[in-house]
Amino acid sequence: MLRVSAFRLLGRRGASRVSLLEDFSFRYYSSGPLGVRDDTRDSRAYFTTPIFYVNAAPHIGHLYSALLADALCRHHRLRVPSDAATGFSTGTDEHGLKIQQAAAAAGLAPSELCDRVSAQFQQLFREADISSTDFIRTTEARHRIAVQHFWGMLKSRGLLYKGLYEGWYCASDECFLPEAKVTRQPGPSGDLCPVSLESGHPVSWTKEENYIFRLSQFREPLQQWLRGDPQAITPEPFHHTVLQWLEEELPDLSVSRRSSHLHWGIPVPGDDSQTIYVWLDALVNYLTVVGYPDAEFKSWWPNTSHIIGKDILKFHAIYWPALLLGAGMSPPHRIYVHSHWTVCGQKMSKSLGNVVDPRTCLDRYTVDGFRYFLLRQGVPSWDCDYYDEKVVKLLDSELADALGGLLNRCTANKINPSGIYPAFCATCFPSEPGLVGPSGRAQAEDYALVSAVATLPKQVADHYDNFQIYKALEAVSSCVRQTNGFVQRHAPWKLNWESPVDAPWLGTVLHVALECLRVFGTLLQPVTPSLADRLLSRLGVSSTERSLGELHFLSRFYGHPSPFEGRRLGPETGVLFPRLDQSRSWLVKAHKT
């Protein structure tokens, strides 16, 4: 989406540093519930993905960003079940020289190319059940208004000036590079040619007069912000990386290009000879979505959580907060950063023909299955590897066998012929192990299960707060295994409903297992929404009983009435998740060629 830029400044910087910083102020928030400030008067929260550049079709990295944001947003809604209080935006970044050139090469107007590729992202996100409340396109009129107003704020505060920049420019990446980011590699003729150290694309020496943002004035305010809030950027290694970057001087930053060179973008207000640089234009999308420049945006900002890939960290953790401070606003509440996906140990690349088509994967592994795989296997702190066999093994083991098998066992007509939530017998399973009497049949492992599932919602919430969704799913999977062990240990299929000795314990075993399943279904809603809906519907859990506030696990065990005891189960919903290895004939590489 965004590309790193840096220049050697030749123009005058002008205004005094002290006078520029006097107006900057900070509001700090602690690591309370995800996306919610300590001082907020309501539960309003705003989640964003990056906006995706329309120079190529979507791949699984794009989908992964969207799924992380979707899961965080859905989990927040479980905590505060009000869609009106939660915003979630995604979209496409549609300006810039690469779009201008790609459209010309394809014989299309830039707007036609943007329409075509943006539609692909929108279709993918619909198919993947991404619950965004807004899809922003930077070619929209509302965005142009927001960007030009933001520009005016920076200019009115003395933070923009015209100057001559000279430096290496990479046309493919649409960015300027410092000398340290340029290397030499043999070209087609064998001569050493300058290329970008990060992308390998050719660079050329360029000199150009542009508008310049006084980024150099913001090094100390940014350090103050990050040192005052250790969780502002999560995971911690990325927070540390940004602080390391800030140990070096920040050069002022080009924020426009000559319109004769770049016409596909938003003009600088009052100067049609310049076009606002695409990366500044793109960042302002986060404000556009919440109504900027109208006053309504203040009810959302800065209560905002950005979910981004590590390749655009500098834009979101240095340039964007500095621009916001310059415009008189606070930095976002949280910046959640994730790493990338490789394919069979290699970086995804068109030249290697190994770019994974996410729509093929959604079709092959089901929407819920592929969502679960990416969020279960993706670890934000480091790159993760994809291959088809790994998907099949994980989904068959955890969704088809463990979770689906558990639901099938506990609702099967042979074991639960009445089709109800059976009664819990407190004498069979007393609340304290020491209270076990002649009728008590619960074992130490059973109490460990109850304890694990009772604490699971808090554990999962903590993992979400720490941007460790994979750990949340690992914790759920562990409890599913424990519950299967509980059922296997007590073998309800060997007990007899007609026996006055067996019946109370048989009902209790099923009641405990169904209560565990209800917790699992509730906690899986952010990750596998359709599967979780089928599971909860099979248990007879209504739509108003699916928030975290309504969970109340195993009330009867704690001496309270249960609204589920004696309730009829919901209608049969079929196999919860079909095994994938039973249809291996279709297991081919889901890659574009």
Curated annotation (Swiss-Prot):
Q: Where is the transit peptide?
A: 1-29
Q: Which UniProt keywords apply?
A: Aminoacyl-tRNA synthetase, ATP-binding, Ligase, Mitochondrion, Nucleotide-binding, Protein biosynthesis, Transit peptide
What is one cellular component GO term in this UniProt entry?
mitochondrial matrix
Motif 'HIGH' region, per the record, lies over 52-62
Q: Where does ATP bind?
A: K350
> What would you give as a GO molecular function for this chain, any one?
methionine-tRNA ligase activity
Motif 'KMSKS' region located where? 347-351
| Gene3D superfamilies per the UniProt record, alphabetical | 2.170.220.10, HUPs (3.40.50.620), Isoleucyl-tRNA Synthetase, Domain 1 (1.10.730.10)
Q: What is its main location?
A: mitochondrion
List the subcellular locations: Mitochondrion matrix
Q: Which reaction does it catalyse?
A: tRNA(Met) + L-methionine + ATP = L-methionyl-tRNA(Met) + AMP + diphosphate
Stated EC number for the protein is 6.1.1.10
InterPro entries the record matches: Anticodon_Met, Met-tRNA_synth, Met-tRNA_synth_2, Methionyl/Leucyl_tRNA_Synth, MetRS_core, Rossmann-like_a/b/a_fold, tRNAsynth_Ia_anticodon-bd
The record's family statement is:
Belongs to the class-I aminoacyl-tRNA synthetase family.
State the protein's name: Methionine--tRNA ligase, mitochondrial
The gene from which this protein is expressed is: MARS2
